[in-house]
C-alpha cells in the first residue's frame, strides 16, 4: 500500500481513486504486515469506496511446488535439508527471499537483480561461481527469471523455480460469487 497506490504498489501504479471502479478489494501478502496495518488499509479503502460496502478479501503467497526449466514438476519437499542459492530479477525481491528462508532448507546465498533483468552469459557465470562458492546443492529463482536462463542449470547446480500461489485467508466465497456473476447468463449479486 506504498504511497497510497494500488496494483501492486508503487509510484507508477493505480491511484487510490481507482477503487471507485472496483467490485471487490483483495489485499495481498497479509502475513507480511500487522493486523493494525491491515485495518488501516481496510479503513482507507472503505473511505474511498463509501457509501458502497465492497467485499474485502485477504491473501497470502504460498509456495506450491518447484519447476525445472524443462517443465518437470518437483515437490517442495525436495528443498528440505538442502543448501539453496536463490536469486531474482524482480521489483521487490525481499518477499521472495523470505519465502525461501521460510522453507526447511538452508539459504546459503541470495543475489538480487533489477526488475526485468536480461540475463547474460556473464550473469550466469557469476551466479554459478557464487552458488558453488557457498556450497549450494540447488539454485532457486522465480518463474519469471527461469524462462530467461539456460535449461541445464548453473554449471552443474540444478536450477528450479519456486512456484508461488495465492491462498485466500478470508472470505473466498465473496470472490467466487463475483466471478460467477461474470459468467454468461448470470446476473450480478
Predicted ranges, named:
Residues 32-41, 67, 94-95, 146-150:
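Short, charged/polar "capping" segments at the starts of alpha-helices
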Amino acid at each position: 500500500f506504498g504511497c497510497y497506490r494500488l496494483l501492486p504498489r508503487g509510484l507508477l501504479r493505480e491511484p487510490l481513486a481507482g477503487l471507485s471502479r472496483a467490485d471487490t478489494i483483495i489485499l495481498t501478502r497479509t502475513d507480511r504486515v500487522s493486523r493494525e496495518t491491515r485495518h488501516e488499509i481496510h479503513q482507507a479503502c472503505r473511505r474511498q469506496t463509501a457509501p458502497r460496502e465492497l467485499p474485502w478479501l485477504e491473501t497470502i503467497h504460498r509456495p506450491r511446488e518447484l519447476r525445472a526449466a524443462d517443465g518437470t514438476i518437483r515437490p517442495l519437499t525436495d528443498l528440505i535439508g538442502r543448501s539453496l542459492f536463490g536469486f531474482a530479477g524482480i521489483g521487490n525481491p525481499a518477499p521472495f527471499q523470505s519465502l525461501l528462508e521460510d522453507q526447511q532448507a538452508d539459504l546459503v546465498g541470495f543475489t538480487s537483480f533489477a526488475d526485468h533483468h536480461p540475463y547474460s552469459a556473464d550473469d550466469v557465470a557469476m551466479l554459478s561461481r557464487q552458488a558453488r562458492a557457498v556450497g549450494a546443492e540447488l539454485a532457486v529463482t522465480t518463474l519469471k527469471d527461469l524462462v530467461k536462463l539456460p535449461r541445464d542449470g548453473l554449471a552443474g547446480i540444478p536450477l528450479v523455480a519456486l512456484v508461488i500461489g495465492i491462498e485466500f485467508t478470508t472470505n473466498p466465497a465473496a470472490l467466487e460469487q463475483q466471478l460467477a456473476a461474470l459468467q454468461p447468463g448470470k446476473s450480478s449479486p
